[in-house]
């Protein structure tokens, strides 16, 4: 039972910038497209780094006039060189993912590295999309009826010895309640774990009984 993939939730096509893109142009792009980060790519579209709002804000905070939200153009300089560019701002060698990775794998990757977004690469290593924490969380917006159907058909309907007709499945805002009878006690944790793995499930309440067990009174 596969999870949703990165491809199903990522933003694509994606805004990309070159290493020489200037500070102000980066700010304009983030504002225009209402995004919080942008990948820096080489001429072939392969990732060199990422520039985020946090990177831009750190630059503003370092200016001589920290009270100015719009520093004068001449203040956005690095040493004796020209305007600050993406190459100066970016986090190099970004952690990336692929379109066919599951949303769970992408979430673990973000959590492990403390990241808010990941570039998505095609088979040639070129940036074709971006996926953010918010994108991954969209799987929890699946309709209850869709979640229930997947549990009945893809979970209960595929476990040997389990009859979907003997198990009640209620879903409310992603919260699942299972009731009814399974033939053997060892099948209960299997059913519960598989239901928890369904995209969009927030919690699973167990009211299952092994075959032959007496229902609790009260």
Where are these regions (language model features)?
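Tandem CBS (Cystathionine beta-synthase) repeat/Bateman regulatory domains
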Residues: 1-218
């Amino acid at each position: 039972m596969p999870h949703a993939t990165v491809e199903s939730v990522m933003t694509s096509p994606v805004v990309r910038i070159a290493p020489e893109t200037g500070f102000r142009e980066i700010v304009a792009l983030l504002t225009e497209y209402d995004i919080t980060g942008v990948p820096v790519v080489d001429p072939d579209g392969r990732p060199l780094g990422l520039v985020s709002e946090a990177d831009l804000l750190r630059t503003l905070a370092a200016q001589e006039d920290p009270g100015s939200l719009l520093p004068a153009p001449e203040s956005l300089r690095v040493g004796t060189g020209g305007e600050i560019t993406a190459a100066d701002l970016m986090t190099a060698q970004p952690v990336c993912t692929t379109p066919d990775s599951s949303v769970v794998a992408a979430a673990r990757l973000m959590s492990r590295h403390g990241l808010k977004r990941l570039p998505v690469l095609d088979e040639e290593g070129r940036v074709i999309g971006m996926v953010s924490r918010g994108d991954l969380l969209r799987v929890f917006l699946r309709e209850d009826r869709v979640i229930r159907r997947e549990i009945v058909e893809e979970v209960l309907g595929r476990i040997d010895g389990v009859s979907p007709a003997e198990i009640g499945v209620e879903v409310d805002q992603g919260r699942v309640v299972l009731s009814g009878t399974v033939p053997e006690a060892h099948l209960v944790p299997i059913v519960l774990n598989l239901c928890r793995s369904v995209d969009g499930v927030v919690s699973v309440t167990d009211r299952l009984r092994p075959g032959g067990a007496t229902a609790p009174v009260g």
